[in-house]
Each structure stands twice: as C-alpha cells, then as structure tokens.
A protein has these predicted regions:
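Basic, polyanion-binding surface patches
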Residues: 1-202
C-alpha cells in the first residue's frame, strides 16, 4: 500500500520556501583561534562556529574539523585562545581560514604578533586583537564533520586603548567583525541597549 504523503504545513503560495536541514544561524562572530603544541609550534585558525555556553562559570565553545592543523594542537594541550576580530583584521581573518599552517607561517605572512597568555602554558594570544579570551578545554564532543571543544574561560585580555574613564571597556568601538552566509560584515549602528524595550519613557 502506497504511503500517503504528509500534507505540507507551509503554504507555498505565501512566498515561503522549505530547504533541507542546514546551518543558517547567522550572523556569527568570525574569530581567530590561536593555539600551540608542546614543542612550541603555534598556529592561527579562523572559526565561525563559536559562542557562549554558560555565564557562570564562564564557558564557550569552538567547533573544528579534525583535519585542521590546529585541531591536534588543541587536543594535545587542552588550550586555545579566542581572539576577537575587527574590520582592520578582516583580510587576515579570511586568509587564516583558507590557508593551512602546515604550508605557511600565518603569523609572519599576516604580520600578527604573538603575546603571552596570562593563565595558559602553551597557547599565545594575538596582540592585534582587541580581546583575547584564554580557554581551557573541559570536554570534546565528536559530533560529525566538526568536533566541539567545550572550554572554561581562564582569563580575558583587553586592549587598553579602548578603556574609557571610569574603567568602562568600549568593545563596540573596536570595529568588530561578523560573518554571515559567506560574507564578512561590520556591525553598523547601535539600535538599542539591553532592556530598552521595557524601559519606562521619561
């Protein structure tokens, strides 16, 4: 007996399309992840599959393909640094994502500077980045095409040039970079502040 086709829930005449399952969660931060092995070989990997997973303790994740050069550095040491990127770093961000550290020295080619991490032993920070998030891996989830590194934040370094009087860090003045569906974008103008939708008008 022929199976009856399920009735579509989406009204195709309403101008909607249904695609096969895929990742369309955009925009995302395009970050440069720095890591090193125990022999001191350091590399940079561009990652968009990243985000916050917990506020307390502060935790984040990155998802990396096992064939990437940096992957085995992170597995060996359990360390990596998430370096936020800016519009000035857009070219280097893309380049470090399409070149392999097996073939080139990304630090040298992109004129990026290694800095010492505060709490990590092996992974360096990128000094040209306005924010360096030092991470220790707590768990690795082998999901499929990518393996997810869950990590606790060990320390955060910030560029003092963006510190204002009173100790406020002007993160949104750094020219942060975003990634959306194959394109790099600036963040644009501020549309509101957290909680503004329920704030009482004066």
């Amino acid at each position: 007996m022929e199976k009856r086709k399920e009735k579509r829930k989406v009204d195709m005449a309403a101008g909607r399309q249904v695609w096969r399952p895929g990742n369309m969660l955009y925009p995302l931060p395009a970050v440069m992840v720095s890591a090193a092995d125990k022999a001191g070989n350091a590399n940079i990997l561009t990652v968009a599959w990243t985000g916050t997973v917990c506020s307390d303790p502060a935790m984040l994740y990155i998802s990396v393909r096992p064939e990437r050069y940096t992957y085995h550095m992170i597995r060996e040491t359990g360390e990596f640094v998430v370096n936020l990127t800016t519009e000035r770093l857009a070219y280097a961000t893309d380049w470090c994502g399409v070149r392999s550290g097996r073939d080139v020295d990304k630090w040298k080619e992109m004129a990026l500077t290694k800095g010492a991490a505060d709490q990590l032993v092996y992974a360096p920070v990128i000094l040209e980045s306005p924010v360096n998030i030092e991470c220790r891996v707590t768990e690795v989830k082998e999901l499929g095409s990518h393996h997810m590194f869950l990590a606790e934040v060990a320390a955060v370094q910030v560029d003092e040039r963006y510190m204002k009087k009173g100790g406020k860090f002007e993160l949104n003045s750094t020219g942060l970079l975003a990634y959306s569906h194959g394109e790099y974008l600036g963040l644009g103008k501020e549309l509101g502040k957290f909680g503004w939708s329920v704030k009482k008008r004066k």
